């Protein structure tokens, strides 16, 4: 695989180009998958399946994921005799696909190992195989076709169960987004079955409840022939349409409704109009939530910290769905970036994987690529818009009180601040083509990004680790500069009596100001280490070029981002890191603020400009009891920012 030979293109790709990239991604992955196939006579002589279990993925789901990928690849190239750089014969791929489909059917409620049965992932454990059998049906024998029908119908029947209702911490939304598409396929593929109408109705019910709010339960609005309140039996999302999972705002689950593309596709391919249920809150969510999260390289921001794999671009399927089904042309610009970055990374890894995660977890990606390919094949794309236009549409301040996050999208940056009970990362991300076609580095979504380590030395015993912050109090989260900037202030406290004050002021231009101070409930010595620390990183396929320029109070990394501190910086910092001040021990009295510090972060700024700005950033006044005033300069001119300390 040649990563150097693949060049990233800034333009928005058309559907034909997207299909080609999706097929390349799938074919590369299939080369890896072929090393995981195992022979077994567990259910019939000459059977087989893939070793495809992994993090969050059951063995059956992993095999189903591979089935749809194989079927799409084989049907897209009906005349090809060999596949992948390994020149795998077509007959081998067809054989493994057929045997895997049969193994999944025979092992449903099986008495041998491995087996699978109705459970919370049951839809995912067979939807890919069911679709694969449909696409590849003319190459399958009657017995296999009959087995697939029997298993599909049995799984569809198992979905007549209680719809989950979980708004806080562990949403029930994802279950709904998985189950509705399966029922859509069963109802349309087997429309001659006496149960098809019931599956169709149940599909709509699961779909409506995927993005259900409290107000939906009272709504008389008519959708799919009934008042909405008659469909809704749950409350799975917050009033602002944000979604929690894993105890935080895990945005992979925010876009889990990307699976609705599979459901809509089932209706379209069998000549029926998709139900309105798949559109429930979809446009409002894009406009008010999810478009705030997609970055210039097509990746999605994790405001409360990374969940699952970093920079896998797995959420590109949501962009495909928004682009084609919801007609959001801007999503196409982000999709174009995401799938190119995924292919570049895959080529660099060289195995077909996207790195970091295990094989079973990785199988979720070719599943998404396969369905995205099918959508681009069967649904016309809206007229494309450029990335510049798409990004401009998303500019502004987004405040999400239920998940405790504020996001500011400005022309050269995205600033994200979290005051979540567990995680309070601060991200200041440079945006623009330099973060796509020629990125010098990325800032990982570490949950401690922009944080600090502080320990008490009062006991005479050195603490090995700082205690976790246990109480967060939001003081302010508001729009400034006529909606073009934002300010967030909060305090966070610990059980040992230490409180940190944090204030972030994101200006409409390239400048963002961070201010902090500390308070202790007891007299004593307190050690503050690495305040406002950031670390740069990169992914496979993108060599990290970090060139550090610095002075006493300023530092610039690769003419990409500049920092100016009110304190003297550490004498030695690795070229990929920043901290706003040297480690220092303070003698503090109970109730008094200490360690006050401010930093101005400039995005997309040459180092000569950062050096010049350093002379113009200064504290005007510091009253440890009341207020800190900071004077700075940016491309918009001079500004004075005041930080009021809590009483």
Question: What are the functions of these language-model segments?
Answer:
Residues 74, 78, 137, 191, ...:
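Short coil/turn linking the two alpha-helices of tandem helical-hairpin repeats
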Residues 630-632, 646:
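Acidic, serine/threonine- and proline-rich intrinsically disordered appendage/tail regions
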Residues 270-277, 295-628, 637-642:
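Extended polysaccharide-engagement surfaces of secreted carbohydrate-active enzymes
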Residues 1, 646-647:
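Bacterial/eukaryotic Sec-type N-terminal signal peptides
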Residues 112-132, 146-403:
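Extracellular polysaccharide-recognition and catalytic grooves
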Residues 36-61, 101-126, 135, 139-141, ...:
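Extended, helix-rich scaffolding/adaptor regions
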Residues 1-80, 84-109:
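Low-complexity, Ser/Thr/Pro/Gly-enriched N-terminal "stalk/linker" regions
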């Amino acid at each position: 695989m040649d990563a150097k030979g693949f060049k990233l293109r800034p333009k928005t790709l058309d559907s034909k180009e997207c299909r080609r990239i999706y097929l390349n991604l799938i074919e590369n992955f299939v080369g890896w998958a072929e090393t995981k196939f195992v022979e077994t006579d567990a259910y019939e002589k000459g059977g087989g399946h893939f070793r495809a279990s992994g993090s969050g993925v059951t063995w059956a789901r992993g095999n189903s994921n591979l089935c749809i990928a194989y079927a799409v690849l084989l049907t897209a190239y009906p005349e090809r005799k060999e596949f992948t750089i390994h020149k795998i014969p077509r007959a081998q791929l067809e054989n493994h696909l057929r045997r895997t489909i049969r193994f999944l059917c025979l092992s449903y409620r099986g008495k041998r190992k491995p087996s699978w049965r109705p459970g919370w992932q049951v839809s995912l454990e067979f939807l890919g195989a069911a679709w694969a059998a449909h696409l590849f049906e003319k190459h399958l024998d009657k017995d296999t076709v009959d087995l697939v029908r029997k298993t599909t119908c049995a799984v569809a029947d198992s979905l007549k169960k209680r719809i989950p209702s979980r708004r806080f911490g562990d949403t029930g939304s994802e279950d709904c987004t998985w189950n509705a598409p399966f029922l859509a396929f069963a109802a349309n593929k087997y429309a001659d079955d006496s149960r098809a109408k019931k599956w169709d109705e149940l599909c709509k019910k699961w779909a409506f409840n995927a993005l259900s709010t409290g107000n939906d339960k009272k709504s008389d609005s008519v959708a799919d022939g009934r008042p909405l309140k008659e469909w809704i039996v749950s409350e799975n999302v917050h009033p602002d349409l944000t979604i929690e999972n894993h105890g935080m705002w895990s945005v992979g689950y925010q876009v889990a409704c990307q699976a609705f593309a599979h459901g809509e596709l089932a209706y379209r391919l069998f000549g029926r109009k998709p139900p309105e249920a798949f559109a429930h809150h979809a446009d409002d969510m894009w406009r008010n939530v999810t478009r705030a999260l997609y970055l210039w390289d097509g990746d999605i921001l994790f405001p409360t910290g990374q969940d699952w794999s970093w920079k896998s671009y797995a959420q590109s399927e949501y962009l495909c769905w928004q682009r084609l089904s919801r007609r959001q042309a801007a999503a196409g610009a982000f999709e174009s970036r995401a799938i190119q970055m995924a292919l570049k990374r895959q080529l660099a890894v060289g195995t077909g994987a996207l790195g970091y995660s295990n094989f079973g977890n990785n199988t979720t990606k070719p599943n998404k690529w396969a369905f995205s390919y099918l959508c681009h094949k069967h649904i016309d794309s809206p007229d494309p818009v450029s990335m510049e236009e798409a990004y401009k549409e998303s500019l502004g301040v987004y405040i999400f009180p239920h998940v405790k996050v504020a996001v500011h999208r400005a022309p050269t940056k995205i600033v994200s601040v979290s005051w979540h009970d567990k995680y309070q990362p601060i991200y200041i991300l440079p945006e623009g083509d330099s973060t796509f076609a020629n990125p010098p580095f990325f800032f990982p979504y570490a949950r401690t990004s922009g944080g600090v380590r502080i320990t008490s030395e009062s006991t005479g015993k050195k603490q090995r680790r700082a205690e976790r912050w246990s109480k967060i109090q939001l003081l302010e989260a508001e729009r400034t500069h006529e909606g073009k900037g934002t300010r967030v202030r909060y305090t966070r406290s610990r059980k040992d009596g230490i409180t940190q004050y944090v204030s972030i002021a994101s200006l409409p231009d390239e400048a963002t100001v961070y201010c902090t101070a500390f308070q202790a409930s007891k007299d004593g010595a307190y050690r503050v280490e690495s305040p406002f620390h950031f670390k740069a990183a990169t992914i496979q396929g993108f060599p990290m070029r970090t060139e550090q320029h610095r002075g006493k109070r300023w530092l610039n990394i690769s003419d990409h981002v500049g920092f100016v501190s009110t304190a003297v910086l550490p004498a030695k910092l690795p070229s990929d890191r920043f901290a706003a001040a040297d480690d220092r021990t303070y003698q503090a009295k109970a109730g008094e603020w200490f360690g006050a510090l401010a930093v101005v972060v400039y995005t997309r700024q040459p180092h000569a400009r950062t050096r010049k700005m350093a002379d113009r950033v200064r504290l005007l006044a510091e009253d440890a009891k009341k207020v800190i005033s900071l004077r700075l300069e940016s491309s918009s001119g001079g500004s004075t920012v005041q930080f009021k300390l809590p009483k």
